[in-house]
Structures are given as structure tokens and as C-alpha cells.
Curated annotation (Swiss-Prot):
Family affiliation: Belongs to the GreA/GreB family.
Pfam families per record: GreA_GreB, GreA_GreB_N
Protein task: Necessary for efficient RNA polymerase transcription elongation past template-encoded arresting sites. The arresting sites in DNA have the property of trapping a certain fraction of elongating RNA polymerases that pass through, resulting in locked ternary complexes. Cleavage of the nascent transcript by cleavage factors such as GreA or GreB allows the resumption of elongation from the new 3'terminus. GreA releases sequences of 2 to 3 nucleotides.
GO BP annotations listed: DNA-templated transcription elongation; regulation of DNA-templated transcription elongation
Organism: Chlorobaculum parvum (strain DSM 263 / NCIMB 8327)
Coiled coil segments of this chain: 43-76
Keywords, in A-Z order: Coiled coil, DNA-binding, Transcription, Transcription regulation
Gene that encodes the chain: greA
Xref: Gene3D superfamilies: Transcription elongation factor, GreA/GreB, C-terminal domain, Transcription elongation factor, GreA/GreB, N-terminal domain
Protein name (record): Transcription elongation factor GreA
Record-linked SUPFAM superfamilies: FKBP-like, GreA transcript cleavage protein, N-terminal domain
Entry keyword DNA-binding: yes
GO molecular function per UniProt: DNA binding; RNA polymerase binding
Length: 159
């Protein structure tokens, strides 16, 4: 069993749906590819068969990974999240101290739910790690590949 992971109800349901799709439809498609490749004869020199078996191996690993994540998941209730500090599932409004006009907002989530296009960043990302445990008014310096970012926490809230 892996480490405990924290998910929203939506995040848990998305993983569950993905697992269902992979273990039913996708698994069936891969088995059909294996059967088709097997029908071509000699398996010792059958690249199509080898590719299908490799795909099956990767699929089964992904299914196992999803099963482990779901088994070790704790579903968080946003109503129970405190906003005195930055925690998982809190949203944070930040002012860029290098460009006072830039205000950004992130929601800290587990790695499984991270989506930068939606402003959802992993608590394990450099930004997430720098923000966890901080309070309104705190200034943070975040090391990223392009250098350092400097922010002030303006607000902590739950969406």
C-alpha cells in the first residue's frame, strides 16, 4: 500500500471512472489486439504481438496504480478545511513582489488532481511546497528552474 493521498470527492470519482474505463473497455481492446496478433502465426518473430503484450503490461500497471491510489485515498470535505494557514484544498491569492500589479491565485491539491490550466497546483510542486503552512501576510521565495519567484500571501480561502 502506498502513502495516503488526499482527494476531493470529484477527484476520487474521476480516478474511479478512469479505473472502470481501463479495466473494462481498454482491457478488452488490448486483449483483442493480442488475439489478432496471435492469429498471424509464429509468436517468436511477431512484432505486433510483442507490442500488444507490452501495451497490456503497461495497462495492467496503470490499473494497479489506480487501484492502489483509490485504496489509499482520503476524501477531504472542503467545509472542514481551515483557512488560518495554507493547507491542501485551500486557495491562495498571491501578489508577485517583483511585479506589484500581478495577482495570481492557486488552489493546492494532490498530485493526482493537479491541473495548471485550472490553477490547481500540487502540494508537492515547488510552489506548493513553499506555500504549505504559511499564513496571510507571509512572504515566500520559490526556487524554480528559471530562478526565484517572490510572493506575498494576500488571502487564504476555500472555494
Amino acid at each position: 500500500m502506498s502513502d495516503r493521498i488526499y482527494l476531493t470527492r470529484d477527484g476520487y470519482n474521476r480516478l474511479k471512472e478512469e479505473l472502470h474505463l481501463l479495466s473494462t473497455q481498454t482491457r478488452k481492446e488490448v486483449l483483442e489486439k493480442i488475439a489478432e496478433a496471435r492469429s498471424h502465426g509464429d509468436l517468436s518473430e511477431n512484432a505486433e504481438y510483442d507490442a500488444a503484450r507490452e501495451e497490456q503490461s503497461q495497462l495492467e500497471a496503470k490499473i494497479g496504480d489506480l487501484e492502489n491510489k483509490l485504496a489509499s485515498a482520503t476524501i477531504l470535505d472542503p467545509k472542514q478545511i481551515k483557512t488560518d494557514r495554507v493547507y491542501i484544498l485551500t486557495s491562495v491569492k498571491l501578489r508577485n513582489l517583483d511585479d506589484e500589479d500581478e495577482i495570481i491565485e492557486y488552489t493546492l491539491v494532490s498530485s493526482e488532481e493537479a491541473d495548471s490550466d485550472l490553477g490547481k497546483i500540487s502540494v508537492r510542486s515547488p510552489v506548493g511546497r513553499a506555500l504549505i503552512g504559511k499564513s496571510v501576510g507571509d512572504k515566500v521565495t520559490i526556487s524554480v528552474p528559471k530562478g526565484e519567484l517572490h510572493y506575498e500571501i494576500l488571502d487564504i480561502f476555500v472555494k
